[in-house]
Amino acid sequence: SGIYGLTQRMLAYNSNKIEGSTLTEKQTASLFETGSLAQEEILIRAKDVEEMTGHFMMFNEMLKTYDQPLSHELIKSYHFKLKSGVFEDMANGYLVGEYKNRRNQVGNIQTALPEEVYDRMSTLIGDYNEKINHTLYDLTVFHSQFEMIHPFQDGNGRTGRIILFKECLKNNIIPFIVNDVNKGDYYHALSEASLNKDYVPLLDFFQKEQKTFKKMSEGFIIPYNDLINKDYIEQ
């Protein structure tokens, strides 16, 4: 399934795993490729399957809209794709594709109150969109501030990381996947950025993940000159 399928599977697996998904890489691949899971003795949580499928749809939505500027509506549309099929969220009364209406907290980070979310997101989006071309540092700052606001009831990390991938594509920056095995480093760097406004550790972390993604995808990339020469020879 090429670079698209590989990225779909690895991004969905790792981003959900960071948030506590119990699905394995093999199960994620099966769900993506066949829409089903092989019968196994272990129990599988319905929520894990629903969120994995939702992440596949969110990734596709991101690819359709990667060149669009960030907006309330676009960010909410990503969250809707991720969460609209999750029964547990609906049963708990969580808003899907809309900003939170209840307080939430992440570790020792004080997130925005529900009544503060719209204004704080407006400021974040507005300040970000004032620039035309963005660097990885700009994306790092945005991600940190987005996660500190925590605008949705649940799914903020996954929505935030899909925005990172989107903005990398839009700004011709090597994209990356935050790997679950590096979750500790990710959270530590995110905490430093959120609490102390020290964005360097998070930037360094993202640069390391860029190298990992580049190495993973190298076999699928054909140099432009090789492609031109191949087309010329075939003519």
Model region roles, listed by residue range:
Residues 1-154, 158-235:
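FIC/Doc superfamily catalytic core
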